[in-house]
Amino acid sequence: MTYHPKSDFLRVMQERGYLADCTDMQALDEAMSKGVVPAYIGYDATAASLHVGHLLNIMMLRWLQKTGHKPITLMGGGTTKVGDPSFRSEERPLLTPEKIDANIAGMKQVFARYLDYSDGATGALMLNNAEWLDSLNYLDFLRDIGRHFSVNRMLSFESVKSRLDREQSLSFLEFNYMILQAYDFLELFRRYGCRLQMGGSDQWGNIVNGIDLTRRVLEGEIFGLTSPLLTTSDGRKMGKSAGGAVWLSGEMLAPYDFWQFWRNTTDADVGRFLKLYTELPVEECDRLGALQGAEINGAKIRLANEVTTLLHGREAAEAAEATARAVFEQGGVGGALEVVEIAPATLGEGLSVTHFLVAAGLVTSGKEAKRLVAENGLRFNNEPVSDANAPVTAAMIGDELKVSIGRKKHKLVRLA
C-alpha cells in the first residue's frame, strides 16, 4: 500500500518521481510536518564542475528549501582524497589538495544558481568535510568509530560486491571511504542537527552506515532518502551525450549546447524530465508530456527553456532558442553559438579538412573527421563538405566559419 505523506517536501518527492527508497517514511514525514529538518547531500570534488547527472539531486535540495527546510551541500574536501568505490570498475586516480580546492570553487558557482545561501532557518549551508576529517587521529578513530562497523556487512554491499565479483582490486583506502562517509553524517548531526541524508540509490549502503553509526554513538533519530538512478528511455546514463559529459558550468559547456541537450530529449522522456528538472506544475508536465507528433517539439523547447533558465538565466535561454531557430529553421548563425578560435599560424598555408577539425578541437581524431565527411555529416556555412583532404585557409574562414557536425552540433570558428 502506497503511503501518502502529509509534509510538502515528501509529497513533492513522491508526486514528481524523485523518491526511490526511504529508511522510515512515516517517521520522517512526521518530523518534516513539525518543523525545519536540515538535510544534506555529499559531493566529492572529482571534477571542475557538476554535470547533468547531478542535477536531479540538486533539484531535490532546491525543493527541500522551497518547502521550508534547510539544505546542506557537503563538499568532499576530505573524502575526495580517498575516492568512492561505489559501482566503479576501477580505482579513481587521486587528486592533489590544490586540484580538489579548485574543483570545489567551480562547484560552488553551480549551487549558488539553485539554492539561497543567506542566513535564516532555511538558509542553505555549504560545508567541507575536511573540517573534521583532516584533523582525525587515526588510532582514536579506529577505537571510537571503527569498532561499530562489520566488515562482513560492508562486503555484502552491492557497490563493493560487484568489484570483488569481477576480481578487481578494492584498496583499503577505498574501503575506508564508507566509514568516512558514515562519519560525515554523525558530525553533521552533532554540529548542525542534520537529520536527513539524501543521494542516488547507489549510495544506499553508505547512507545506512551513517544512520547506524549515528544511532549507536549519539542515539540520534535520523533518516535516509534516495532517488532513482536515472537513465533515458533508450537506456543511456543521464548526464552524458555523444560529446561527453553535459557540464553545468557555462565555461565548460556553452549555454546554447546545454539548451540543445534538453531540446534533443527523446519524446518518451519529456513528461518525466519536466517533473524532475523544472518547477512547472505536475498537471502541466503531464499535459506537455502527452503531446504527440509535431506538438511534442514545443514541449521540448519548453523543457529546454525552463531548465536553462534555472541554471543560466532567462536571457541565456531566450538567446539559445533564438539561435536554434536561426540555425535550424533559417540556416543562419545565432548569437549563442559557441565560438572556437584557431591561430592563423596553426593553419599555415592551409590545413586539410581532417587536420583542421582536429586542430580546432571539433573532433577527437582524424578517423572521426573522415567518417563525418564520408557520411555527409559535415557542413561549412551550410554547404556540404565532400573532400576530407580539401584545404582550409585563413582566407576561407574570414570573419567566421560556421561548422555543422551532424544535424545538431554547430560551432563558429574564428581566427585568434
Swiss-Prot record:
Domain S4 RNA-binding, chain residue ranges per copy: 351-416
UniProt motif 'HIGH' region: location: 45-54
Keywords recorded for this protein, A-Z: Aminoacyl-tRNA synthetase, ATP-binding, Cytoplasm, Ligase, Nucleotide-binding, Protein biosynthesis, RNA-binding
Gene3D superfamilies with a match to the protein in the record: HUPs, RNA-binding S4 domain, Tyrosyl-Transfer RNA Synthetase
Entry binding sites for L-tyrosine: Y40, Y177, Q181
GO annotations of cellular component type: cytosol
PROSITE patterns in the cross-refs: S4
GO biological process, one term: tyrosyl-tRNA aminoacylation
Gene Ontology molecular-function annotations: ATP binding; RNA binding; tyrosine-tRNA ligase activity
CDD domains given in the database record: TyrRS_core
Domain of life: Bacteria
Location(s) in or outside the cell: Cytoplasm
Binding annotation for ATP: K240
EC numbers for this chain: 6.1.1.1
Function per UniProt: Catalyzes the attachment of tyrosine to tRNA(Tyr) in a two-step reaction: tyrosine is first activated by ATP to form Tyr-AMP and then transferred to the acceptor end of tRNA(Tyr).
Family label: Belongs to the class-I aminoacyl-tRNA synthetase family. TyrS type 1 subfamily.
Record protein name field: Tyrosine--tRNA ligase
Gene behind the chain: tyrS
